[in-house]
Each structure stands twice: as C-alpha cells, then as structure tokens.
C-alpha cells in the first residue's frame, strides 16, 4: 500500500537546506523580538544554522547516491548533479563569508541581526531556485531571494543612497511580476 507522501513524492531531505536556513531565521527572529539576547549568542545560532545547512546538503548527496536523478514534490523539485553543485556553492559562500558579513553588518549598529536574517532568507530563496524543476518554483525561489536583497539594500534608512537603491531594485524587480502575468493573458483566454 502506498501512502500519500509516496504518491506525491514528498521527501524533506531534498528541501532540508532551505528548511534549515528558515529554521535559523525563525530562531534569530525569536531571539531578536521576544528576548534580549547578546550578539555572541545570535552569532553562534547563525553559525550553527549554516553548519546545519551544510550537513543537510551532505544528506542530499546520500539521497542522490541511493536514488540517482529524481523528482520530488510532484515534479517541482529536482535532485541532480547540478542542484547538488549549486547547493554546495551557496553553502560554501555562506560559510566562508559569514565572518565578513557579520563584521560589515555591525556598521549598521542596531540592525545587525536584521541584516543577517535578510542574507539567510536570500540564500534560502536561491537554494530553492537552484532545486526548482519548473518555472513556477524557479520564480518563487527568485522572488524569495530578491525581495530579501531589496530589503537589505534599503536597511540603512539614514543613507540616501541606500533608500535610492532599495526603491530602484524594488521597482525594477516588480517588472518581473507584471510582465509574465501580462504575457499569459492570451494563453488564459484561449483555454
């Protein structure tokens, strides 16, 4: 007897790196909003979250070695060599640039954790984009990653250039939504 998860191809190991980053973001948000947590604890939590992401990428290698190239979540997420290489690249960039973006975000004083949360959200969107098998999932991953970067560009509200960059990226990025939607109108009308 097959279960619903087997029919739909649900396997959480495939999206585990994205889920690990989102879990790290939720813990950092909790530490920022509800309780006053020292910066070294937030730095430790984010570093452990990045290591957990790298571990889940390692688990994806094991799944790939047992199942080979496979499709999951009703052909929305693809596990192949290119997705694994992309996941490793994003994970290594997160690991090796962790200290530098922590030091850079300290220049914004009170918004250090917010900058780190936006960077991790952007990375989770790009991980989802790398694993996408169809264009809708690719677009969702791109939007998660890019909206976080738009907010990151405008994080320093006291700087006029930061506000200008955020507005410019936001307006140019919104064109990505308007244009695909307007190009689908003839398709929807024809059935």
Residue ranges and their predicted role:
Residues 1-191:
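Alpha-helical transmembrane segments of multi-pass membrane proteins predominantly involved
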């Amino acid at each position: 007897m097959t279960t619903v998860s087997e029919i739909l191809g649900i396997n959480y190991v495939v999206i585990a790196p994205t889920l690990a980053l989102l879990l790290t973001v939720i813990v950092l948000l909790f530490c920022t909003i509800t309780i006053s947590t020292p910066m070294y604890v937030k730095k430790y939590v984010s570093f452990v979250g990045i290591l957990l992401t790298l571990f889940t990428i390692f688990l994806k290698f094991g799944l790939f070695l047992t199942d080979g190239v496979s499709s999951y979540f009703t052909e929305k997420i693809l596990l192949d060599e290119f997705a694994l290489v992309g996941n490793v690249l994003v994970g290594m960039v997160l690991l090796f640039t962790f200290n530098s973006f922590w030091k850079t975000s300290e220049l914004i004083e009170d918004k250090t954790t917010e900058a780190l949360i936006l960077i991790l959200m952007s990375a989770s969107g790009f991980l989802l984009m790398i694993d996408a098998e169809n264009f809708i999932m690719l677009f969702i991953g791109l939007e998660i990653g890019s909206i976080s970067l738009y907010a990151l560009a405008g994080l320093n509200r006291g700087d006029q250039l930061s506000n200008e960059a955020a507005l410019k990226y936001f307006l140019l990025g919104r064109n990505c939504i308007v244009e695909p939607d307007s190009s689908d109108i003839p398709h929807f009308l024809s059935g």
